[in-house]
A protein has these predicted regions:
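Alpha/beta enzyme core
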Residues: 2-9, 13-144, 153-166, 171-174, ...
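Alpha-helical transmembrane segments of multi-pass membrane transport proteins
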Residues: 30, 183, 188-192
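Active-site pocket-lining/capping segments in soluble small-molecule metabolic enzymes
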Residues: 195-196
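Conserved small/polar residues in nucleotide/adenosyl-binding loops
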Residues: 200-204
Length: 204
């Protein structure tokens, strides 16, 4: 009876990617995002069936009745971790925690590609926002994710010092050779197209 099979490729991958995040079956972990539109529940069911390890709820502003309802309904659907946001206040974080999230994304408008502050007139400096959210998330054992505003390596340190458990990097990595995306040649320079979570097309 065959109990398992290990190939040379498996050994090479383990050596090359020793820090890869894998589940108990050795599969790479994968999170998937759903919006808050009418079909979010069907999409979430399909993603969970496909093996998504976590569900991210994408919304420009996370402290809304709609987002709270979506979190509550997804919590009934699955025990997979739910990540929601974005919020910038302790009150917003507290409401998301009550709704059933395991992690909260912090930041309204600090990202290099984000226009939420300009369009809606709502936002808060990222350091202050992280402190606000962490003040209620940390005691509750909920992960704090700093989303946006990371332009220099020092910004990562500042986010962690403010209370974030981890940071999301978009624009900082989007222009690297390793990142996916169409290369655009303009005035003798190379650029890459990249998109924000809630945008269909965005310039680089």
């Amino acid at each position: 009876m065959l109990a398992g099979l290990i190939t040379e490729t498996d050994i090479q991958k383990r050596a090359m990617f020793a820090d890869a995040s894998k589940d108990e079956h050795g599969h790479l972990r994968c999170g998937a995002a759903v919006g808050v539109g009418p079909d979010y529940l069907d999409r979430a069911k399909a993603l969970v069936s496909a093996g998504a390890d976590a569900l991210f709820i994408d919304a420009a502003t996370g402290h809304t009745t709609r987002v709270m309802d979506v979190v509550s309904n997804l919590r009934k659907l699955t025990d997979r971790p739910i990540v929601a946001g974005n919020v910038v206040t302790a009150e917003g974080a507290s409401d998301l925690i009550k709704a059933g999230v395991q992690a909260i994304k912090v930041g309204v408008g600090p990202g290099s590609i984000c226009t939420t502050r300009v369009i809606s007139g709502v936002g808060m400096p990222q350091f202050t926002a992280i402190q606000e959210v962490a003040s209620v998330a940390r005691p509750a054992g909920v992960t704090v994710i700093a989303d946006g505003g990371i332009r220099y390596s020092g910004d990562i340190v500042k986010a962690l010092a403010a209370g974030a458990d981890l940071v999301m990097l978009g624009g900082l990595l989007a222009g690297t050779e390793e990142s996916p995306g169409k290369v655009v040649h303009y005035q003798g320079r190379h650029f890459k197209q990249y998109r924000g979570c809630l945008l269909y097309t965005s310039p680089s």
